[in-house]
Amino acid sequence: EHFGLTEGLSTCAMPSGQQNYPVSLYETIRRFKTMPDAFVCANDFVAMDLVKALNELGYSVPDDIWVCGFDDSQEASYFAPRLTSIHIHGQIMGYTAANLLMTRIEEPSLNYRTVYTETNLILRESTGD
């Protein structure tokens, strides 16, 4: 709700394995009949490519559209505009993954489960902050 994303948020899925990813991203966005208020991307590098594509199409980030990455890469804070991102705690995620793997090895018949871990939203210029 902080971002005002509760209404009008669109989902964009692109086929994986694209040979020319930036061009494919550009072409996918160009076909949108209406643009969402914001994009939340799978990682910061996708978000940075998205910002470039939006700029080429005449959109301004954050004035027209907000963009948020995921993983809070070092590049996110040097990119223009500085990229809002979701910081994941690698040590916690690694510990949790190793724990799940060990449990699965010991008891392979256990049901799969979803695990949630702590993250932090790092607000920067790409969402108007």
Question: How would you label these PLM feature ranges?
Answer:
Residues 1-129:
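Bacterial carbohydrate/catabolite-sensing allosteric modules
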